[in-house]
């Protein structure tokens, strides 16, 4: 498998697909912990402008010349001259006798093939909002080359139904090749039928092989957004993500940043090259990707010779065996990524955990696990996994905005502040860093400062949907509901499957009393992520407001089954049971809730109410007293209930004021 992985890594590097080269380099380094595999991983990160990650990877490598040279180049960019000099001087005896290799063969270097061109074309279509065309491009890219993992991830992000078992199969034209170094001329003439698309009843009879992808893309790009046309039309075009105004601001920022010694130049000609870098819609400042950029061009000839000699020793049969093994591994990765994109979280978790242990301990898998636990609302476990990722790759900023949100939910201000400090120090031009800082200010209820940080993040990347969603929540916290709705709509324009923005719009309408609009947006979010207990609870809240208690109870019960530890869903369920005069079942729910949230005054207050109604005065007094001790602000309500302990109440939920605030929001 290692030979095939090395071929794939160089193939990805030749085609400037650095996300894929990082992905395969991680797989190789997990299997073969050697200087060569470490160099390939570091070199891929270097080409991806992840200089701090390169520095961390190569900091302790002593005698390997290519690694030392790459470390020196990285130290030069980061301004850490002393460390670079020490590393180069330490292995002087190893590189002093190396002769220039000007006549090194370039026959193994290739040009972008159809799959690479389709991948970058699809990425541009996706960023421009043409999801149907983007889907067609990605489908064809994966059909031509199943090793194109970034195209596969783009398909999962769009929401196309896929079957990973049928995606990651060796195409016929590849089985006749000894390796990737042979020409692939006319390879597209034998493009396999994209059988990996899951057929729906509506599209199974269609003769167009891309009919499924068209229907999926259209469902998100047209029907789902049509109801919001009038709202989007009201938004000033200059404020929309990716508008001329913001692109001008972004270019201005890039121009200003040239004075930084650690920041490289950026120009318009490189935009197309940067579009194929990441499906998470981030932007970075990049430098020209020319052959002169390659820092190891002279010192990696030994690696290339070793690679060529290994190819000479490898037989077509051995390559086929490696391809088969690698495809089995990719099927597991593909299933996990697809299931996570579909929010089938338990299945995704099982899939990632079924990977070989060395693969589980790589940044890619740890990030996916952290996101999976986060979506499962298991913030403690998510924090644990993300912290492991931070220990493994301390300079990584990708996906750290999810980590910061988990810390925000856990109310852990110190770790969140530390994370914000570290990410800003190592990645000051990353939008994720500024969103993390915004979460830090938000936790301190400094919403104005948080909004300033978010605006900076949007300047750096006008297509970062998380920033718009966070901006919407901060405006909502300031009761600026119109601005909040505008921000959430911008997030949806960037990514129509970003369910958090649909949820945010629903909450704004819920707060402003527009129950029908709130229900529509919650339902839309739940269509994207049907396994989120919070969304199901919010739909139940709409029915509760409309006094349809039985329907509300159905949704609360479903939410409790999705997340047994959801205090909000269980509390709402108990309240509805009380409204239906089913006090015994309500008591059971509250007892379970007490075990989940023993320090929640609301729970004890409601328990006291029920015991009072059941004429169990001692238990009622006990829980009223506990509630009093836990929430001193609600003493007037609790005191009144204690004073009227002998007077039965017709409606136990008449007093739903201050004491319910924590669980109601």
From Swiss-Prot:
GO terms for molecular function: DNA binding. The APC/C is composed of at least 13 subunits: apc1, apc2, nuc2, apc4, apc5, cut9, apc8, apc10, apc11, hcn1, apc13, apc14 and apc15. Interacts with apc10 and cut9. Belongs to the APC3/CDC27 family. It comes from Schizosaccharomyces pombe (strain 972 / ATCC 24843) (Fission yeast). SUPFAM superfamilies: HCP-like, TPR-like. Gene3D superfamilies: Tetratricopeptide repeat domain. Coiled coil: none annotated. The keyword Repeat applies. TPR repeats lie at residues 115-148, 329-362, 363-396, 431-464, 466-498, 499-532, 534-566, 568-600, 601-634. GO terms for cellular component: anaphase-promoting complex; cell division site; cytoplasm; nucleus. The lineage of its organism: Eukaryota, Fungi, Dikarya, Ascomycota, Taphrinomycotina. GO terms for biological process: anaphase-promoting complex-dependent catabolic process; cell cycle switching, mitotic to meiotic cell cycle; cell division; metaphase/anaphase transition of mitotic cell cycle; mitotic sister chromatid segregation; mitotic sister chromatid separation; protein ubiquitination. SMART domains: TPR (SM00028). InterPro entries: TPR-like_helical_dom_sf, TPR_rpt. Keywords: Cell cycle, Cell division, Mitosis, Nucleus, Repeat, TPR repeat, Ubl conjugation pathway. This is Anaphase-promoting complex subunit 3. It is found in: Nucleus. Residues 191-257 bind DNA. Component of the anaphase-promoting complex/cyclosome (APC/C), a cell cycle-regulated E3 ubiquitin-protein ligase complex that controls progression through mitosis and the G1 phase of the cell cycle. The APC/C is thought to confer substrate specificity and, in the presence of ubiquitin-conjugating E2 enzymes, it catalyzes the formation of protein-ubiquitin conjugates that are subsequently degraded by the 26S proteasome.
């Amino acid at each position: 498998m290692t030979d095939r992985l090395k071929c794939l890594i160089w193939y990805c590097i030749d085609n400037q697909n650095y996300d894929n080269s990082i992905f395969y380099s991680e797989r190789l380094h997990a299997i073969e912990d050697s200087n060569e595999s470490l160099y390939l991983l570091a070199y891929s990160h270097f080409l991806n402008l992840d200089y701090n990650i390169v520095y961390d990877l190569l900091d302790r490598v002593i005698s390997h010349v290519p690694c030392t040279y790459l470390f020196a180049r990285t130290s030069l960019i980061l301004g850490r001259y002393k460390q670079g000099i020490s590393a180069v001087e330490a292995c002087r005896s190893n590189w002093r006798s190396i002769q220039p290799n000007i006549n090194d063969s370039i026959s193994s270097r290739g040009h972008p093939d159809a799959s690479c061109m389709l991948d970058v074309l699809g990425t541009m279509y996706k960023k421009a909002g043409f999801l149907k065309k983007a889907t067609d491009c990605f489908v064809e890219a994966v059909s031509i080359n199943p090793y194109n993992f970034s195209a596969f991830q783009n398909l999962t992000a769009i929401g196309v139904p896929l079957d990973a078992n049928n995606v990651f199969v060796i195409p016929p034209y590849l089985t006749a090749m000894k390796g990737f170094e042979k020409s692939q001329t006319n390879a597209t003439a034998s493009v396999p039928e994209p059988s990996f698309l899951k057929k729906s009843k509506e599209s199974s009879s269609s003769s167009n092989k891309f009919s499924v992808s068209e229907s999926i893309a259209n469902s998100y790009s047209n029907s789902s957004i049509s109801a919001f046309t009038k709202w989007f039309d009201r938004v000033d075009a200059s404020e929309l993500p990716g508008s001329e105004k913001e692109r001008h601001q972004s270019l201005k920022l890039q121009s200003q940043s040239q004075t930084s010694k650690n920041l490289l130049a950026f120009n318009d000609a490189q935009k197309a090259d940067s579009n194929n870098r990441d499906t998470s819609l981030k932007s970075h400042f990049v430098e020209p990707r020319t052959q002169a950029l390659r820092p190891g061009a002279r010192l990696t000839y030994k690696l290339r010779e070793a690679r060529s000699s290994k190819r000479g020793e490898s037989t077509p049969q051995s390559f086929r065996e490696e391809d088969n093994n690698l495809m089995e591994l990719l099927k597991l990765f593909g299933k996990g990524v697809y299931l996570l994109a579909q929010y089938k979280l338990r299945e995704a978790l099982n899939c990632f955990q079924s990977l070989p242990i060395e693969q589980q301990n790589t940044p890619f898998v740890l990030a996916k696990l952290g996101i999976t636990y986060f979506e499962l609302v298991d913030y403690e476990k998510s924090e644990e996994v993300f912290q492991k990722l931070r220990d493994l790759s301390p300079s990584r900023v990708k996906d750290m905005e999810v980590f910061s949100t988990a810390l925000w939910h856990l109310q852990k201000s110190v770790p969140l502040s530390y994370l914000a400090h570290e990410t800003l120090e190592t990645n000051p031009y990353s939008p994720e860093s500024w969103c993390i800082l915004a979460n830090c200010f938000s936790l301190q209820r400094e919403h104005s400062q948080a909004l300033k940080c978010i605006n900076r993040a949007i300047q750096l990347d006008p297509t970062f949907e998380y920033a718009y969603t966070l901006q919407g929540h901060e405006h909502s916290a300031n009761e600026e509901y119109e601005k909040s709705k505008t921000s959430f709509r911008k997030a949806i324009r960037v990514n129509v499957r970003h369910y958090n923005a649909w949820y945010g719009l629903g909450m704004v309408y819920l707060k402003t009393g527009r129950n029908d609009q709130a229900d529509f947006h919650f339902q839309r979010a739940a269509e994207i992520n049907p396994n989120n207990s919070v969304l199901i609870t919010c739909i139940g809240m709409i029915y509760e407001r409309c006094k349809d208690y039985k329907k509300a109870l159905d949704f609360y019960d479903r939410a409790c089954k999705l997340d047994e530890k959801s205090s909000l869903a269980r509390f709402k369920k108990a309240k509805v049971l009380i409204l239906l005069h089913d006090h015994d079942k309500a008591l059971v729910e509250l007892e379970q809730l007490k075990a989940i949230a023993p320090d929640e005054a609301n729970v004890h207050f409601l328990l006291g109410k029920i015991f009072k109604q059941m004429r169990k005065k001692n238990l009622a007094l006990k829980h009223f007293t506990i509630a009093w001790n836990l929430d001193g602000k609600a003493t007037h309500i609790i005191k009144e209930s204690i004073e009227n302990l002998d007077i039965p109440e017709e409606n136990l939920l008449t007093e739903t004021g201050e004491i319910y605030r924590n669980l109601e929001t």
